[in-house]
């Protein structure tokens, strides 16, 4: 007699816990419920340039403000690369420079390829 009610309660418990686990999965996948569970909710970066424009306008620089890094330097070709751990800065002459991905090449390989391309050899 006692087995049927226990089986029914156990089945109900399994169904409820499975449903709750599924809803938690969907909440996490679609970003819902984070603040309710006490997790810090980080705001994603904006898809427009408003943050960049505010930061650019608020930067104080009496020389040249680099557009990629917002660094204040004496000349545009002195601007650092935004990602120096994976990029090399290559000066093109006439006060201009570009940052190129190293891509696993040997040191100086990116600069060599750019120079070959400028000469029309690549």
Curated annotation (Swiss-Prot):
**Which UniProt keywords are present, listed alphabetically?**
Signal
Top-level taxon in the UniProt lineage: Eukaryota
State the similarity comment: Belongs to the LCL2 family.
Role noted for this protein: Probable component of the endoplasmic reticulum-associated degradation (ERAD) pathway.
**Annotated organism of origin:** Talaromyces stipitatus (strain ATCC 10500 / CBS 375.48 / QM 6759 / NRRL 1006) (Penicillium stipitatum)
Cite a single GO BP annotation.
Answer: ERAD pathway
* Name recorded for this polypeptide: Long chronological lifespan protein 2
Instruction: Point out the signal peptide segment.
Output: 1-21
